[in-house]
Amino acid sequence: MLIIGLADCNHGTETALHLMAKNIVAETLKVFVPYVPKTEYDFSNQGRIITFEKAEMEKALSSSVRGDIILYSGSSYLNIEIKVTHEVDLEKTIELFNLGIPTIEVDLSDIKSDFTPEIIAERLLAATHIRLIHSPKTKEYFARRILGEWKKTTNNSNGTHVKDCPLSRKNAYFVDYCRKGGKNECHNCDAYIRYMNDHSVFDEAMFLCYGCLDGIDFGKIEKILHLKKDENHIHSVKLLMADGSVVERGISE
């Protein structure tokens, strides 16, 4: 007697969903491509459905990275990652950054066993379930996103600040917050990237900040050679710059 466990069923569903999504992309050659932001303050929700010319599945992008499906149009191409259970992790994001591979991720993780080709095809054209992983057009923007730290916020009469700011100075009340260049609020700091008040992601409001890497020109980062980073803290980083120099930072624990 053949007994199939729940784990086997889940794996089978995952495999079928993943394969169906790739086949639909290969057949239709269409996918929604998000707008490529130029800066952290570029909040446009625009994007568009693009029709490509050909597709290639499971293509090796490097010795360690394989794309789910690549779409081609002339000399341009787009790598598509299908998320069923696992999203593109930090290690792969860095690989894609270093290789300069334009990549999007299609999120199918909420779709269970009752899916149809029509449901998947619709999802592939919907902005709400597709995120931009990397675009070489705005490399500086993505370098900041990879190297930024999520920091908890605190509020006082001077505004909203991160706790334990890496650029902090002690004020008269011995409260740590950034006063870089005379600016005394995170929103006005050069190291501020973005604000997140989504309690489904974090328990409290957070800032994405790169103050720990103050002085590095993000626009000249060629490759991220090493990054030791936990959820909210960078411990060490090694960067190859455009002029061939290497910048290393060991950040205190």
Cite the ranges covered by each PLM segment.
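Short amphipathic alpha-helical segments with coiled-coil-like heptad repeat character
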Residues: 7-13, 88-90, 197
